Amino acid sequence: MTHTDCPSLLSFRQADESDLLELVRLRDAAARWQIERGIRQWKPGELGRSHFEAILREGEAWIATLGDRGPTVGAWELWWDDLPAWGEQPPVAGYVHRLMTDRQTAPPGAGLVMLAEAERRIARSGRALCRLDCLSDNPRLRRYYEDAGYTVVGEQPSKNGDGGKQYGVTLLEKRLREQ
């Protein structure tokens, strides 16, 4: 199976409060997977239920499943501004955060399919850009996004992140076609 087989397999829905524990589970599992591979991006237990409750109030979280009723294969957050990384900006972009897949259920290429769905959601809202960031010292993730059509547009050396910690991030964006 290739990522081109994936679109017909995945369904997408906006997350609600009944999904909070699933979002935490996905995030923690993704963090453990990263650590096992020497990737310093996330830590298990770093973001809990209260984080995702805030996202549901202030932005959007999306769930991807195999078919309409199948198991969860991944999720992502969609924000309509991102002051910590991008500062004050005109409303021309959507910001994707915490793109994560379930390594037990996600078919190959599911991450790219979910990213494309996030891009469609942003384009349908009338915004022309999809923006995201990754740790400056994570070249593997940066390459993943560049291979998906994203361009590096800057560095933010001291992003104020979750829990008040500061870290450097690479800023990437992709111009979207109208949907």
Where are these regions (language model features)?
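Conserved N-terminal entry element of GNAT/NAT acetyltransferase domains
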Residues: M1-S18, E178-Q179
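Conserved catalytic-core motifs of GNAT/GCN5-like acyltransferases
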Residues: R131-C134, E146-V169
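Hydrophobic "lid"/C-terminal helical patch
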Residues: L23, R27
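Acetyl-CoA-dependent GNAT
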Residues: E17, D28-A106, L112-E117, R121, ...
